[in-house]
Amino acid sequence: MALQISKEDTQVLLKDKNVLIEPTIEKYRTAGQIAQTALNFLISLINKMYHEKSMEPLPIHQLCLLTDSFIADCLSTKFNNKVNEKGISMPTCIDIDEINENWCPEVDDIENLSRWNQKSRSTKSIELCNGVTSSLSGFLKVGDVAKITLGCHIDGYTCNVSHTVVIYPTVQDAQSGKLLPEAALLGGKADALAATHIAVESVTNLLAAANDLTKLPADFNATKVTGSLIRTVVDTIAQSYNCCVVPGSRIRRIKRFLSGQNENIIVERDFKGVIWTESHQEAAMLARTVNETAVDVKRKNPFITEDTVVPTDDFTVVKGEVYMIDLKLAPLQGLEPGLITLHTVDQFSGKSESSDVVARPGAICRDFSKSHVLKLRAARQVLTRLDKQGVYPTKLAHIADSFPLDVQEPDFETIKQEIKPFRLGLSEISNNYLTIDRDVTIVKHVPWAKILDLTNPSGVSSYDAMAKNKGLYPGFELPLPKLGLSNLQLKSLLKKHSTPVPVVRQCVTVAICDEELLRISGNLKSNWVHSVYSMDTASNIVAGIFKLAQLSEDKRFGLKIRETQPWKMKF
């Protein structure tokens, strides 16, 4: 369904409203302050429960709901009667180890998760992966790597943030008597944490260099910041630390109400960003194994415009743009050469494989391109409440009358009772495709030896919404287009020959202003880790990365980067 609007409205909505003037920057800055304050609030709760042990641990679903309530309370104090919309842009998610994203169960799903997964058993992995076990139990364990993701928006100007927290074993200090981490994190998880932190910092510095191209190091052999240069920098860092960029990672430009939350619904014609998919791993594998130097020459068709919906690296970063850096890396330690891909968790029980996890998506997103006359009164009431939430993902708990909860004395039972009638209405809404589920995904590894045994030139799997629905654009219909492996074949391999792999995530939002780069979110310190890997300084790309890091520390002649600080609050 395509919505026809005038050219004047298009100019206002997509151009004028995204100019980085002072009121717009202030909305981004305020959203960043609230997001970072909420992140500090949740991290402080986790530290008190598992490191300081000064309070009883709360289940994951309660931690998520408390953080969402904290964000809603903070938003209620800003821009009142000045903006039409403000709210949560991403429900708080706590994804542990191999769980990739979107783990934010509702308060009424805890008993269901235990019942649905009674027969599930843990699978072997390269390193201890307790993500599924910890998530089903609802509590974190020592050694878990928890990825916290949340976000908010003010008038459509969005700030999402992700940070990874490590649950350390603690020992009591002899002098102070406080509980301190026993030792640094080692192994593959430490490699991924170090690589992710360095990659995000390097890309941030690279985007800051777009303000003053004279400070772009000559080692990159580039005169401007392009998508291909960004991909090269991230891939170089990942390879140096023996890691792989997980499919779905992205560095993309965001606009008002367009922060990548509806990529399966909305087709963005003016898309700018770097996207990592399985096909990039396939191309890298073939480049290493096939002794060919031939290069495919793509001739430009004069009858085809540059207006495309397929993500490409052929773009240039310029001033006045806002970018979201969302990187997820998985370690390759102890793995044979293979493919890192995503396995979607669904809510269908009665599967033949007892190791399959059954979970219902907690986050849903309203598809405003579809309409339907609903029969149930409960469905119409739920749809009315969902329409008020806007285009961003939400939860049933967010539309309850008792939300937001009192952070000091939360009443989870009341909101649990309110959600029960919403379930009936949501069933009819989702059956008529008025909402889209934000599926929970798990990162898994499949050996190339098993993949090469299969081939099938059919199947549809794409990143882009239009290509996914219409089967357009050769190369994007298949996860592995050159090998001809279909999506169904890949799913069969995931059931028989896959291994769960831990993943680390970090997401920040930056704005390239006229004189400086404004770091809207993501200035938290990295975890205490020790990695056995380091980057090769003989490489030109690595040398350029180090020079950018030095320029970022030079406050006088270096890169001009300003950070948005969270609110000073005692938790």
Curated annotation (Swiss-Prot):
GO biological process, one term: proteolysis
A GO CC annotation given for this chain: nucleus
Main location group: cytoplasm
Listed GO MF terms: metal ion binding; metallopeptidase activity
Disulfide bonds: none
Name of this chain's protein: Probable metalloprotease ARX1
EC number: 3.-.-.-
Lineage: Eukaryota, Fungi, Dikarya, Ascomycota, Saccharomycotina
Subcellular location: Cytoplasm; Nucleus
Superkingdom: Eukaryota
